[in-house]
Each structure stands twice: as structure tokens, then as C-alpha cells.
Amino acid sequence: MAIITLYTDDIAAKYESLKDSIQTSFDNKFSEAEWYCPMTYEGLREFIAESEDPDVAEWMVNTNQELYDAVEIEGIIDVVGSTYFYDGVELIPVDLFPDYLEEVMPAWGYHIPDFLVVDWKVVADVVADDYKMVTYQGQDYYFSA
């Protein structure tokens, strides 16, 4: 059974796309406004957080899912660390962690004799102490800290 894991560099590509989409949407909507000036994505995030302009509030409502997705990914970046995030950290679904360990332990050089019966849930509970957890799209994932 192949365990499906995520890699943060794939999420990073989605994040960059979201940032571009949010910024383009904002620029297209407000480029004619008297207060408008070009800004970085980070500057845009700060601006919309502090803005009291009703048009900006309406734009935020219409762009809610993209903003939510970007903020969720920023939370992962905060936990993983930006350097590691962009390098591609493997995210393992928590509910599949015992199966993941059973699959990868031999590849890591651990030979388990056939006559032993391993309770992989117990192994996962012990090994989980060496991992950190993040949540992405409602799913909890472990990653190696």
C-alpha cells in the first residue's frame, strides 16, 4: 500500500499562485482609486488588515476563499520554517502514520524479523514524539522536525 503524502514545495507553488491571484485581483479592482499605490503582497496584506474602506471590505468578502487559503499556508510556513517549507518537507497524514512507518522502516534500514508481530500503532505513538504536526485543508499531518 502506497501512503500518499504531501510535500511542502507543492503547497509552496499553490501559495505563490494564490499570492499572485490575490494581488492581481486587488490591482485590477483598485488601480483607479485615488489612494491606490502598487505594493508587495506583504504590504497588501497589511493594508487590507488595517483598511476601513467599504470597497476593500467588499473585495475581501469576494476574495475570502483565496485569502483564507493563503493564510492557512502561511500558518504552515510559520510552523515548518520558510527555508524548509520551500525545500519540500514531507507531510504524512496522522491517520496513516502507522502504515507509513510500516512501509518506510525497511527502507530506513530497520530489519524486522518475520517471526515478530509489530503493533504499528504503538510504534507510531512512540515515534510521533519526534515529529511536529500541522493542519492543512482540515487534515492533520506529521513532519520531521
Which residues make up each language-model segment?
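Acidic interaction surfaces
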Residues: 1-145
